[in-house]
Swiss-Prot record:
PANTHER family: EQUILIBRATIVE NUCLEOSIDE TRANSPORTER, EQUILIBRATIVE NUCLEOSIDE TRANSPORTER 4. Functions as a polyspecific organic cation transporter, efficiently transporting many organic cations such as monoamine neurotransmitters 1-methyl-4-phenylpyridinium and biogenic amines including serotonin, dopamine, norepinephrine and epinephrine. May play a role in regulating central nervous system homeostasis of monoamine neurotransmitters. May be involved in luminal transport of organic cations in the kidney and seems to use luminal proton gradient to drive organic cation reabsorption. This is Equilibrative nucleoside transporter 4. GO terms for cellular component: plasma membrane. Its main location: membrane. Keywords: Membrane, Phosphoprotein, Transmembrane, Transmembrane helix, Transport. GO terms for molecular function: monoamine transmembrane transporter activity; nucleoside transmembrane transporter activity. Residues 88-99, 155-157, 219-229, 364-376, 429-439, 498-518 are cytoplasmic. Residues 1-21 are annotated as: Disordered. The keyword Phosphoprotein applies. InterPro entries: Eqnu_transpt (IPR002259), MFS_trans_sf (IPR036259). Residues 1-10 have a biased composition (Basic and acidic residues). Coiled coil: none annotated. The gene is slc29a4.
Amino acid sequence: MGSKGAERRKQATPGQTPEGNVVMSFSFESYQLEEEDCQGKDISDKGVLALSEPAFEEAVPDDRYHGIYFAMLLAGVGFLLPYNSFITDVDYLHHKFEGTSIVFDMGLTYILVALVAVILNNVLVEMLSLHTRITVGYLFALGPLLFVTIFDVWLERFTIKQAYVINLMSMGTVAFGCTVQQSSFYGYMGMLPKRYTQGVMTGESTAGVIISLSRIFTKLLIKDERKNTIIFFVISICMVLVCFILHLLVRRTRFVQYYTSLARRGLSHAKDHSQHASQYQVHHDVITEEGNGAVGCSPAGDGCADFAGGNTYVRFDVPKPKMKRSWPGVKDMILHRYVVARVIWTYMLSIAVTYFITLCLFPGLESEIKNATLGEWLPILIMAIFNISDFVGKILAAVPYEWNGTRLLFFSCVRVVFIPLFIMCVYPAQMPMFSHPAWPCIFSLFMGITNGYFGSVPMIHAAGKVAPEQRELAGNIMTVSYMSGLMLGSVVAYAAYSFTASGSSFHSQTGYNFTQGY
């Protein structure tokens, strides 16, 4: 733990102005008075005192044992785990709601509500505090999980039609809460070093892997479907609670408070912060002062006091009063977002295009890939390969490489090649061009890696392209782009699903694990 800068009054240090006037500086916050070189300057120049940010004699906090990084990884797990919990018990859903498209309807409900939530969160970013939004998000995510587990799965209080509607409503509530968390966390991570954004995004992929393993083991160990589903949901609830408690603990750590306070004061991260640290200085300017040549000072604005005694001026420095932040007007909010979007627009398009292409294919079109030998296991295998490779891609995003925004957008668009490749794995229905099961597995592997990588890199780098005080807003704007890509991809996938489902009875007779890797 670093020691704070001494806040005792330093011994007065005199400074000489070009006209021979003496300036005495008494500092209460480790400020220094420096004399600026005045050689070669016109003798008529006046001395002006300038105030900039204080230099804090505080050691940069360290993420000892990578505990903060691990907590942020679990944060990514926490805000996608409730959604994955509803989707991953696909066997229970298909058995209970036989002959319906419950999994697909829940996925579409999630995307549509999530888009509304991320836009609303973007509007409220200046109105509600960061941690208020995250806490509310956790409560909205946990509530439906508890309600469905107790009243629908355990007590079975509803009819089939009622349960269907309640599950969709629960998914919508989860979507709202989880998306508010997600959008807020991206803004939160924008204030921390880049690796923590990568940690959160890796956690998103980890959520799909963890919840899939949880469902596999509960189903293998407990044969009764209702009991293993209850235990599955209880495990999910406990994991979300752990993530929530970790968030409450981590937000109070010195590491997080140090970096978030830097960002809110408009300073860079620690290594840049040391370069910007400055003191009171005597600057020479051509601005005309009072007739007696006094050094100008604004007592009300700078919290200083001048005492004229001959040609001697004494300045006492006191901390600036904190100003209460008022809510901005609509025009200001639009202007703030426009200014940020002008800087990061290539990153916004990159992440939107990446997830649009992925959602066009996953899980909709991939679930239609059939094979006589592997049967219904092929789509499950393809989904598993995608989730694992997506996880690997997000880990690779941690490798330091400075991407140019235009190149990043180009490579994100190149991924469109996966669309015709997967179509050739499905059509023509009687004999697809890529009929061997290895082909869709290979395509899914590369699609997952590129989705994880190009879905993470724009989010990681975008916050570093704007001023520190704009980083939380940049993270929220990037999440709007991210969710826009998901929504547009889901709409296209829904059209493809309706088209293929009408001509195939195979899909209606089997249930697949549509665990989302995004």
